[in-house]
């Protein structure tokens, strides 16, 4: 972390990282020794979840540098969730690595975050010293969501570009045709 980033702590409001298009990502950074541990959250998850904060406590106790962040449209980051794609979230992750953790890193990803961490590691192999993947969901747009897309959902995706997927955790959330098509690319 640079001296400027060392000033950011995990207490209080998150810091922000500007992204193209004027949106910002939200993050908390804990200064410490390297390699920096970087948390990659899951689909519709945010950096305030129990896994992200438990790893932060562990990092603090060890004096380990740590970054947790919210992707575009997640948590405290700007942007409309329905406009997010794997490509966009991968770009967010690479920006976090470039701007907030430019040295050696260990990526920790949960669910979709495991997929994004793998995609980031393929682009930055010299930087990534390790991967810890918790229930990674590579290709979840095809493997996990595909079987759930019934005739009514397909019709909604064809007609409006959006399917409101039921959720066990709250209100249904938008799955867009662009997310599914973009997921096929990776």
What are these regions (language model features)?
Residues 3-31:
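N-terminal cap/lid segment of alpha/beta-hydrolase-fold proteins
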Residues 22, 127-186:
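The alpha/beta-hydrolase serine catalytic core
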Residues 34-42:
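Short beta-strand element of the alpha/beta-hydrolase
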Residues 43-56:
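The serine-hydrolase catalytic nucleophile loop
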Residues 56-78:
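Conserved alpha/beta-hydrolase
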Residues 83-100:
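Alpha/beta-hydrolase active-site loop
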Residues 101-111:
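Alpha/beta-hydrolase fold nucleophile elbow
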Residues 114-125, 131:
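Short glycine-enriched nucleophile-adjacent loop
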